[in-house]
């Protein structure tokens, strides 16, 4: 700060004459020394522009008086120990008003020195507050966080974000001091409205929210942004900030929070569900220009914000207002909006030296994603927050997992993949709503995984009247219809019909032991990676994210190299979900399984013979596989990087064994196996050539047919001899029927078949796993089966997904194989 002498105005009065040897000690006036670069009418009513005035300079005015002594001929003003202003006075001046402009915020001790020549007397210190929205005048916010939130910290290079909502300070009594910000990289502030057509807003709070917005927008143009609830945002006295500060409300808390956690990113989220109507006017560039300019001014006014988040629900339509949405033009308008916002933020960065982020929360259904070219938009964006929740809810009575990663176990393959026709015979248009489908669709568009953040639900959605008697699959509530939204009181965590806070679910449905309380049973769909609680007696069903499912989301994010996770909304969590976000993101990827190799030996050939050898490799993770073959000197290979190779035996004078090694790699892990190739001399009797037999499974009491493929180089007739343990019986021959005895648990036993040409014999061994499954009946075409019923058919165990009769296991989607 340069000392300002030229523009200083000094009001003074000469109260006494002759000079004394020492200056008088000045006293500062009693009035508070408070200034602000953003002036807020903390007691007023009116529009946003009437209540909030921003300026670049504050005018400091310091009234002082020296009640005794000879006065002085110059003065100095200090903020703490920093000299910020000085000037000359008529000799003997004993009172006055020092005025000067100032451009830097802070909270200081103010001192005025009255001087006679170079000898000065300093006043007692007095607090001066020069407020600005960067929060530099504030002390770090004192926190009041639920101790269930661990001190995890953030994860370098990853996103752990959460929404904080403006209205949370009311009934939920959740202000900024309660945010576990030490564990967050991002806070998304909900919500900043756009002036203009907002018909959807009339549907909530009997129109009061809409009327409040009309007041806030009274002096603004359509498509400018404002503060929706000034009392909550900037007027109300809040914990942790002096009630007399010039700027109050949760904004003052957020400013102080940045003093405690300067690396935390806080973004205003513009729009939201019932505030999305004006976005549909952005197909008009003039409207976008108005909006972008307004956002720039908003960020210049509220300096604690680190960018902007756009929550347009939804480009193309299917948002809260059924009359809005242009599937053709909304998508290009969205991309243009991102480009124009990024250009504006770049300008702001050049002006301020700061960095600003541009993010967007987006719908996660296939029908939402297909309307926007996110690959084109991503170049302007830092992150895309995929709202992978709200897949099902009490807006209708169809139950399902509202935030599952994958399809529920109750869905057919066609329902999951979006193929075939629905119950009305109408062709399905796209895959079921799941987190995985959303992420995969975005990746298929070409979106960089490092820009994708997966959504976590810190709340549950629920229904009444979900009864087991109505379930298509007994015991699976997702196959029973609801009968209206979940009901309850706010004390039970139900703030609106059909929605319950996670912390209420944990306390009132899951319980401390985790096994369910108050009549609820705790369920988890392994296939969907989705949690639910269900009260069979009263029919209450709640689908939600649990710590287990959130950890699975974190592992999914790691597996697919996503940026991280974010949650809606932080006031509904007791710390469990945010802790689980950290645990999932630091737990590593879902463990990769190494490929398996099925080929076995020895392989018998004669000199010069060519034999095909197949690695018979598979991978449980369905990873693409690569192959590498290495043959001992003498063996010739047709290739060395294919799944099967043709091996040519050398000419030998006597029986010789050679090693043939194959390595199968899934991109991360590899498996290596060596097979012995036995080469017999030409003219000598060559042993039979036997193709290795793959391992099989068979249910106890059931039979399986095993075919042995063997040839003899001389064309001799072959005989087969089977060696089996007591658990099996077998009929000899190249095609044998193996019958399993009863076992008390799954049992694996070896079976050896000896193939002989009358001179030489070759053994090949494979494993038979006997499944303990005698309790399952054989499938009967005339019998009715319901979800969960198991049967044996063709030596395999199948489980019904839902009601079925006459549909053959292995050929119909209603059955899933339990063993093969």
Curated annotation (Swiss-Prot):
Leader sequence segment: 1-21
Catalytic activity: Random endo-hydrolysis of N-acetyl-beta-D-glucosaminide (1->4)-beta-linkages in chitin and chitodextrins
Keywords: Carbohydrate metabolism, Chitin degradation, Glycosidase, Hydrolase, Polysaccharide degradation, Signal
GO BP terms, alphabetized: chitin catabolic process; homophilic cell adhesion via plasma membrane adhesion molecules; polysaccharide catabolic process
PROSITE patterns tied to this protein: GH18_1 (PS01095), GH18_2 (PS51910)
Domain of life of the organism encoding this protein: Bacteria
Entry's EC annotation: 3.2.1.14
Coiled-coil residue windows: none
Alphabetized GO MF terms: calcium ion binding; carbohydrate binding; chitin binding; endochitinase activity
GO cellular component assignments: extracellular region; membrane
Boundaries of every GH18 domain copy: 158-588
Influence of temperature on activity: Optimum temperature is 50 degrees Celsius.
Active site as annotated: 313
Record keyword Hydrolase present: yes
pH dependence: Optimum pH is 8.0.
Pfam family, one: Glyco_hydro_18
Family statement drawn from the similarity comment of this UniProt entry: Belongs to the glycosyl hydrolase 18 family. Chitinase class II subfamily.
Protein name (Swiss-Prot/TrEMBL): Chitinase A
Organism: Pseudoalteromonas piscicida
Gene this chain is encoded by: chiA
């Amino acid at each position: 700060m340069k000392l300002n002498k030229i523009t200083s105005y000094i009001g003074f009065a000469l109260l006494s004459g002759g000079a004394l040897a020492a200056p008088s000690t000045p006293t500062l006036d009693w009035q508070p020394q408070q200034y602000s670069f953003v002036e807020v009418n903390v007691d007023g009513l009116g529009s946003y522009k009437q209540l909030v005035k921003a300026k670049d300079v504050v005018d400091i005015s310091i009234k002082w008086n020296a009640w005794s002594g000879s006065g002085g001929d110059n003065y100095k003003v200090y903020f703490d120990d920093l000299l910020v202003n000085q000037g000359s006075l008529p000799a003997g001046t004993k009172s006055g008003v020092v005025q000067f402009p100032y451009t830097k915020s802070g909270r200081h001790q103010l001192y005025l020195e009255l001087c006679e020549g170079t000898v000065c007397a300093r006043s007692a210190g007095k607090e001066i507050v020069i407020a600005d929205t960067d929060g530099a005048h504030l002390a770090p916010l004192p926190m009041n966080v639920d101790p269930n939130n661990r001190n995890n910290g953030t994860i370098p290079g990853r996103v752990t974000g959460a929404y904080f909502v403006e209205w949370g300070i009311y009934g939920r009594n959740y202000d900024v001091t309660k945010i576990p910000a030490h564990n967050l990289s991002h806070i998304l502030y909900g919500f900043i409205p756009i002036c203009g057509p907002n018909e959807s807003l009339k549907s909530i709070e009997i129109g009061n929210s809409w009327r409040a917005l009309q007041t806030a927008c009274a002096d603004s143009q359509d498509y400018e942004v404002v503060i929706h609830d000034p009392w909550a945002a900037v007027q109300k006295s809040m914990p942790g900030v002096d009630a007399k500060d010039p700027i109050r409300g949760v904004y003052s808390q957020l400013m102080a929070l940045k003093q405690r956690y300067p690396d935390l990113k806080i973004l205003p989220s513009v729009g939201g569900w019932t505030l999305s109507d004006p976005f549909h006017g952005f197909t008009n560039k003039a409207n976008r220009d108005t909006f972008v300019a307004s956002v720039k001014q908003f960020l210049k006014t509220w300096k604690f914000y680190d960018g902007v988040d756009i929550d347009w629900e939804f480009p193309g339509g299917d948002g809260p207002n059924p009359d809005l949405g242009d599937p053709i033009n909304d998508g290009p308008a969205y991309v243009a909006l991102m480009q124009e916002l990024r250009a504006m933020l770049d300008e702001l960065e050049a002006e301020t030296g700061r960095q600003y982020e541009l993010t967007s929360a987006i719908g996660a259904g296939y029908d939402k994603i297909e309307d926007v070219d996110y690959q084109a938009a991503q170049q302007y964006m830092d992150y895309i927050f995929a709202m992978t929740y709200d897949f099902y809810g009490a807006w209708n009575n169809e139950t399902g997992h509202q935030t599952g990663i994958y399809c529920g176990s109750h869905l057919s393959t066609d329902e999951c993949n979006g193929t075939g026709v629905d119950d009305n015979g109408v062709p399905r248009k796209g895959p079921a709503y799941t987190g995985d489908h959303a992420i995969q669709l975005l990746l298929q568009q070409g979106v960089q995984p490092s820009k994708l953040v997966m959504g976590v639900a810190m709340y549950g959605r629920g229904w009444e009247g979900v009864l087991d008697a109505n379930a298509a699959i007994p015991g699976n509530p997702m196959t029973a219809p609801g009968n209206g939204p979940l009901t309850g009181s706010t004390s039970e965590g139900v703030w609106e019909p059909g929605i319950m806070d996670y912390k209420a679910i944990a306390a009132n449905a899951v319980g401390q032991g985790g096994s369910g309380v108050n009549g609820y049973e705790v369920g988890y769909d392994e296939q969907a990676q989705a949690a639910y609680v269900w009260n069979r007696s009263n029919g209450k069903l709640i689908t939600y994210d649990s710590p287990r499912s959130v950890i699975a989301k974190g592992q999914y994010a790691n597996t697919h190299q996503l940026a991280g996770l974010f949650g809606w909304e932080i006031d509904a969590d007791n710390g469990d979900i945010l802790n689980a976000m950290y645990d999932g993101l630091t737990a590593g990827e879902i463990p990769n399984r190494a490929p398996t190799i099925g080929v076995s030996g020895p392989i018998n050939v004669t000199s010069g013979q060519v034999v095909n050898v197949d690695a018979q490799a598979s991978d449980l993770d369905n990873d693409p596989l690569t192959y590498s073959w290495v043959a001992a000197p003498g063996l010739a290979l047709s290739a060395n990087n294919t799944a099967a190779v043709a091996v040519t035996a050398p000419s030998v004078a006597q029986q010789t064994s050679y090693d043939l090694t194959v390595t199968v790699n899934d991109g991360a892990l590899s498996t290596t196996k060596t097979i012995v190739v036995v080469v017999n001399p030409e003219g000598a009797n060559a042993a039979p050539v036997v193709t290795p037999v793959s391992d099989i499974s068979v249910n106890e009491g059931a039979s399986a047919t095993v075919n042995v493929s063997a040839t003899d180089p001389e064309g001799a007739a072959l005989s087969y001899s089977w060696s089996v343990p007591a658990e099996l019986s077998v009929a000899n021959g190249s095609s044998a029927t193996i019958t399993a005895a009863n076992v008390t648990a799954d049992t694996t036993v070896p079976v050896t078949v000896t193939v002989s040409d009358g001179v030489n014999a070759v053994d090949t061994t494979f494993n038979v796993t006997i499944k303990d499954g005698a309790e399952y009946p054989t499938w009967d075409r005339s019998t009715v089966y319901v979800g969960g019923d198991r049967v044996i058919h063709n030596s395999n165990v199948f489980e019904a997904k839902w009601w079925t009769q006459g549909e053959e296991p292995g050929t119909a989607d209603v059955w899933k194989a339990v063993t093969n």
